[in-house]
């Protein structure tokens, strides 16, 4: 989810937002429900200690579950009596392998990593353009296929995120099918197992449309957004909604976001 994090406006807005969320989160408590948290990257913090510390604190308030278990509970419309949390990460940065996966394994659960095959296979020029102009996240490197295959063999789920982190809210069906369908085929070829999960890039409901969602639903068993978190579903029940977070966020922020009563 690209953001111009270097702008003065963004920095001031983030500062004010942090203060408000820290106050609200101090008095918030995660509510019963199935919560899928979606992250992307590390920033400048010390890792994996920061992420490990966040999960240690969060585990005092919620129960961590496997990603596929969360999906099953949501799609069968279960109503748990405690807050359940599963994790996904978009874009396939190297910290998924180096940091996020090992820490999550310490809790006996997994996560789903949504990846872009052309980013994985791109030369440095492609990678730099992807980082600076597509996802606006500086100085990143993608996971390699051997690392992704290892994660899959360790029980992590690998999902599709289009070939090029493409915004799918257009009407060019040929391009949409390339970005959505071809992505699935490449992942399945590389991993030797079905790819059932798709998360559309950028995540807002306005950044997809009925045509692209229908193509995705024809191709994958499950489709995900990163929007409208208070509701389990969007696009008339076709899309499962996730809640954005980042591993360097304060625990108060997560406590506040998880305090919503989901419908």
Task: Say what each PLM segment does.
Residues 2-87, 95, 170-263:
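C-terminal active-site subregion of NodB/CE4 polysaccharide deacetylases
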Residues 33, 38, 42-50, 67-154, ...:
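Active-site beta->alpha N-cap acidic-glycine motif
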Residues 65, 112-114, 159, 223-224:
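Structural detector of well-ordered beta-strand residues that form the stable sheet scaffold
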Residues 115-117, 162, 172, 191:
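Generic secondary-structure microfeatures
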Residues 116-118, 163-164, 203, 228:
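Histidine- and/or cysteine-centered catalytic micro-motif in compact active-site loops
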Residues 142, 162, 173, 177:
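Acidic, His/Gly-enriched loop-helix segments that form or flank divalent-metal centers
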Residues 157-165:
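Histidine-centered catalytic micro-motifs
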